[in-house]
């Protein structure tokens, strides 16, 4: 679970007022998932074949990494010293809302572990150990160890993320978390343990952006699993109604839908069947 560390370890629950920002300028930040994102996360994930279409691109990578033959959702980094290496996903997004899961073991992150998005022109290799994603104006990245956001890092200062952190606090990012790219609103956000961390980057509209990570840890393996996407059209009323019913039931009771006095077709609809 995502944790905030000061002198000891505390569990972060974004719904708990204890962890709302203390700084006045952060009070207006919205930590509630947008409606479209909430609906997408309630949908079943796409098939494995579709996940492969959105997976890592073995032809768009640093030479020090490769996509595994036995699991094409995972890439492996060779243990090359004084090198930072990155890889892009196969699909560049220009419209719609897209969510993918990154699985990156905490023990395999090292000093510079960065996750984000990039244009096709962003560099994928650098000599030395550096925050490669976010290093210039072609990429946007979250450094998982430093809890900092980088974009055009050579010219712009980094920002704290999640924004509720105080200067003496560290947020421990778990092995798996979600990345949400909304090309219609032009935002990049992250979800940890089901909790929306707020918008990390804005101003992305009009670009073509690819999932990207940069790594320095030898033999690290990073998995990307595309969950689903939504086109920019208005949300259908039927989908909103289904979401309302599922919310009213709660995740723990979705298995009871079969026992409800409803037509079989409606039960199937509520279960995304």
Curated annotation (Swiss-Prot):
GO cellular component: cytosol; SCF ubiquitin ligase complex
Subcellular location: Cytoplasm; Cytoplasm, Cytosol
Keywords linked to the UniProt accession: Cytoplasm, Phosphoprotein, Ubl conjugation pathway
CDD domains noted in UniProt: SPRY_SOCS1-2-4
Domain of life: Eukaryota
InterPro entries found in the cross-reference section: B30.2/SPRY, B30.2/SPRY_sf, ConA-like_dom_sf, FBXO45-Fsn/SPSB_families, SOCS_box, SPRY_dom
Endoplasmic reticulum listed as a keyword: no
Pathway(s) per entry: Protein modification; protein ubiquitination
UniProt-listed GO biological process terms: proteasome-mediated ubiquitin-dependent protein catabolic process; protein ubiquitination; ubiquitin-dependent protein catabolic process
Modification sites for Phosphotyrosine: 31
Species of origin: Bos taurus (Bovine)
Family statement: Belongs to the SPSB family.
Domain (SOCS box) ranges: 232-273
Subunit structure as annotated in this protein's UniProt entry: Component of the probable ECS(SPSB1) E3 ubiquitin-protein ligase complex which contains CUL5, RNF7/RBX2, Elongin BC complex and SPSB1. Interacts with CUL5, RNF7, ELOB and ELOC. Directly interacts with MET tyrosine kinase domain in the presence and in the absence of HGF, however HGF treatment has a positive effect on this interaction. When phosphorylated, interacts with RASA1 without affecting its stability. Interacts (via B30.2/SPRY domain) with PAWR; this interaction is direct and occurs in association with the Elongin BC complex. Interacts with NOS2 and EPHB2.
Protein name as it appears in the record: SPRY domain-containing SOCS box protein 1
Sample GO molecular function, one term: ubiquitin-like ligase-substrate adaptor activity
Domain B30.2/SPRY span(s) in chain numbering: 33-231
Pfam families found in the cross-reference section: SOCS_box, SPRY
Function noted in UniProt: Substrate recognition component of a SCF-like ECS (Elongin BC-CUL2/5-SOCS-box protein) E3 ubiquitin-protein ligase complex which mediates the ubiquitination and subsequent proteasomal degradation of target proteins. Negatively regulates nitric oxide (NO) production and limits cellular toxicity in activated macrophages by mediating the ubiquitination and proteasomal degradation of NOS2. Acts as a bridge which links NOS2 with the ECS E3 ubiquitin ligase complex components ELOC and CUL5.
Domain comment, as recorded: The SOCS box domain mediates the interaction with the Elongin BC complex, an adapter module in different E3 ubiquitin ligase complexes. Essential for its ability to link NOS2 and the ECS E3 ubiquitin ligase complex components ELOC and CUL5. The B30.2/SPRY domain is involved in MET and PAWR binding.
């Amino acid at each position: 679970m995502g944790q905030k560390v000061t002198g000891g370890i505390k569990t972060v629950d974004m719904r708990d007022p204890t962890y709302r920002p203390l700084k006045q300028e952060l009070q207006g930040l919205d930590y509630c998932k947008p409606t479209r994102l909430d609906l997408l996360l309630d949908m079943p994930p796409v098939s494995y074949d579709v996940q492969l279409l959105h997976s890592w691109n073995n032809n768009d990578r640093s030479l020090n990494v490769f996509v595994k033959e036995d699991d094409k959702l995972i890439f492996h980094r060779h243990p090359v010293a004084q090198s930072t290496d990155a890889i892009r996903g196969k699909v560049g997004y220009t419209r719609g809302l897209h969510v993918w899961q990154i699985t990156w073991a905490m023990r395999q992150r090292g000093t510079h572990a960065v996750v984000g998005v990039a244009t096709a022109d962003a560099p994928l290799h650098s000599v030395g150990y550096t925050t490669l994603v976010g290093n210039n104006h072609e990429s946007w990245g979250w450094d998982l160890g430093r809890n900092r956001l980088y974009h055009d890092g050579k010219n712009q200062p980094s920002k704290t993320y999640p924004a509720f952190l105080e200067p003496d606090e560290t947020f421990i990012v778990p092995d798996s978390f979600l990345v949400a790219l909304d090309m219609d609103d032009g935002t990049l956000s992250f979800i940890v343990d089901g909790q929306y961390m707020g918008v990390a980057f804005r101003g992305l509209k009009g670009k073509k952006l690819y999932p990207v990570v940069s790594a320095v840890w030898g033999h690290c393996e990073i998995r990307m699993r595309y969950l689903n996407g939504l086109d920019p059209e208005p949300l259908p009323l039927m989908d909103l109604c289904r979401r309302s019913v599922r919310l009213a039931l709660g995740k723990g009771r979705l298995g009871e839908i079969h026992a409800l006095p409803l037509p079989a077709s409606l039960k199937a609809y509520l279960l995304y069947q």
